[in-house]
Amino acid sequence: SSTVVFNKTLGIYTGHMGIDFAADAGTNVVAVYDGTIESVTTSYLQGTTVTIDHGNGLKSVYNSIEAAENLTEGKAVKKGDVIGAVSDNNRQEYKDGAHLHFEVIENGEKIDPETYLLSSEK
């Protein structure tokens, strides 16, 4: 489900799917579970997004990162592998500062990521 938040950069209320983790640019971003890199995409507004397919309908999405150089579609990753670094390349949320935007997709639907993160992983 989506949470309505005020986007300081755009000056509007908008739906927000996922969790934002504030961190310094350059902070390592790691895979939350074992899986396969489904995609690495870059857009002007959202910056770079990495999607990992964990199987059984579960995917994790990492937005506003600098992807690791060796990260390519189809590459296998393990839980804890560095997949990139936090970036400030998300132009639609730049007033929020550098942060990781994290989402979880289950069977094609975006769900609350907190249900998949242990308190020690947040």
Give the label of every model feature segment.
Residues 27, 56-58, 109:
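Short acidic/polar mixed-charge low-complexity motifs
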Residues 40-41, 65-68, 86-89, 107:
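Residue-level recognition of beta-strand microenvironments
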Residues 31-67, 99:
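Zn2+-dependent peptidoglycan hydrolase active-site motif and core
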Residues 1-46, 79:
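Surface-exposed, glycine-biased beta-strand/turn segments
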